[in-house]
Amino acid sequence: MFRKVFSVALVTCGLLVIVQAAKKVEQCEKRIPDSLKPKLCQIRQYQLLEGADMEKHIDCVMRALGFVHPDGSGNYHALIEPLNAIDKDRKHGFNLETCGGNRDKLPKRKRAYAFYKCMLKSTSADSFKKAFDLKELVNAGKLSATAKYSPQVDTLMAQIDGMICK
């Protein structure tokens, strides 16, 4: 009986750690693979780097922001409202559909990066970056959950990036 209770408690604690680890971008950055540590500044500036380590890191970040589903595919509904709040344009729905559409054929570990990369190459890229930055700041507790994109987002991101990109 004790073993069963202990096993259930251990599994529950493990799941809580996994869920909590995916709440903030900062937590993903603390666990970034060694190969990417010297490139973190570039990554934060939305430069696309290729490789399994980058895919793993972006998967963590996109999950932390809630921009992908548990299977790594893009979450249309999590992004359409923030994108349109920044710049109301029908292109966002089209780009989210396009970027999310063909990713199901990829292995789960590659989906989030493929979606991220596609969005950064789309006509919604600027709005995507702004929504990404805003959500990062909200999740980090630096802005309220009801915050809208404003110049304050740029200021706060510049401060964070300034500490990382020395």
UniProtKB/Swiss-Prot annotation:
Similarity-based family: Belongs to the PBP/GOBP family.
InterPro entries: PBP/GOBP (IPR006170), PBP_GOBP_sf (IPR036728)
Span of the signal peptide: 1-21
Provenance organism: Anopheles stephensi (Indo-Pakistan malaria mosquito)
Compartments (UniProt record): Secreted
A single cellular component GO annotation: extracellular region
Statement: the UniProt record of this protein carries the keyword Oxidoreductase: no
Entry keyword set: Blood coagulation cascade inhibiting toxin, Hemostasis impairing toxin, Secreted, Signal, Toxin
Entry superkingdom: Eukaryota
GO biological process: suppression of blood coagulation in another organism
Activity modulation comment: Zn(2+) modulates binding to host coagulation factor XII (F12) and high molecular weight kininogen (KNG1).
SMART domains (alphabetical): PhBP
The keyword Signal belongs to this UniProt entry's keyword annotation: yes
Pfam family, one: PBP_GOBP
Protein name, per record: Short form salivary protein D7R1
Function recorded in the entry: Salivary protein with anticoagulant activity that targets the intrinsic blood coagulation pathway in the host. Inhibits activation of the host plasma contact system by preventing the reciprocal activation of host coagulation factor XII (F12) and prekallikrein (KLKB1). Attenuates generation of bradykinin in host plasma. May bind and sequester different mediators involved in the host response, such as serotonin and histamine.
Tissue distribution: Female salivary gland (at protein level).
